[in-house]
Amino acid sequence: MLKKKIEEEAAKYRNAWVKKCCYDGAHRNDDETCEERAARIAIGPECIKAFKSCCAIASQFRADEHHKNMQLGR
């Protein structure tokens, strides 16, 4: 489900290197926020925008998935 959302977002960008920025943003990193990670990008504003967008989508998806109700069979 997350992979599909990220692929849909990456499809909005024409350049392969901008798509890569998006995919890089989707990688999990619990130690830093999306903003902190994006601050290290030196390629350009288009890459930063794609990175932040995909990072936000992935972070939101993971937060929503984390809070799903789980029943254990005992």
Swiss-Prot record:
GO CC list: extracellular region
Protein name, UniProt field: Complement C5a anaphylatoxin
Organism per entry: Bos taurus
Database matches in SMART domains: ANATO (SM00104)
Main location per the UniProt record: secreted
Region (Involved in C5AR1 binding): 15-44
Cystine connections: C21-C47, C22-C54, C34-C55
Record keyword Membrane present: no
Taxonomy, superkingdom: Eukaryota
Biological process annotations from GO: complement activation, alternative pathway; complement activation, classical pathway; inflammatory response
